[in-house]
Amino acid sequence: NLIACPGYPEAVQNMVDFNTEIGNTAFVVGDTPFRLEPTGTALSNWGNNTAMATDNNETGVVTYDDYLAFYYPSGLTNDNKGNTIVVPPSHMMLNTIVNSDAVSYEWFAPAGLNRGGIINATSAGYVDMNGVFQSTAVPQSLRDVLAGVKINPISTLQGSGLVCMGQYSRAKVASALDRINVVRLVAYLRRQLNILAKPYLFEPNDAQTRKEIKGAVDSVLLELVGQRALNDFIVVCDTTNNTPARIDRSELHVDIAIEPVKAVEFIYIPLRILNTGAIASGNYGSLAA
């Protein structure tokens, strides 16, 4: 369910096209260039394609897609012979996403201290103009710039090491699909529903079949509610969406609407100082901001 071509940002559009061909049932992990410098200007220019590149390359990125995400920066690790090598962001994130899925589900964000830790690289950084790897911690100021262009930062956090601190997809417009956990949930659902629907091919196109397939879909979605993927859902498979004309064309329609669970990305904890006795007396007003 993951697609990547580590080290080749120019292959991103090809991967997106392939995912489109297979019905957007996977998630594309894209790379930023090795030589992309950790400055606000450089990152903003690349993410916004200020140079007006016509293809994805070192000067800019042109591809937008809900099922695509970019990460920054690259990493430093050792190969099988013990040599120190530079690896692209996807090298780190493929491992991180797989590890996240192993302890949770695809609809849990592969980011943050619980599931976003990078364990297959020793530092993060970029390759300078002399071909030398330079480490960078990707501080909050750069993380804010990266968020503005929907690129997910791999930061060095004190006491925690390398951690992915973002889960933006490369969606062109703001929607639930501009977050990776929701995108991967939808891709997962598409795969499961494709499998679920196949046994109903060539069954009688009648009320019983409609009832059976609706029950099967309800069961899958109800399980996802229990697994913290969905807040709610609705499934319609009756004569309202299976009209006589559709039945005469040998079609069976199942319409589904879902409310995906969103991830916490910002935490606000304001601290108020009160006079002695204010809490005991109840004279502290509302604590809600």
Where are these regions (language model features)?
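Structured, hydrophobic secondary-structure cores that serve as assembly/anchoring elements
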Residues: 1-289
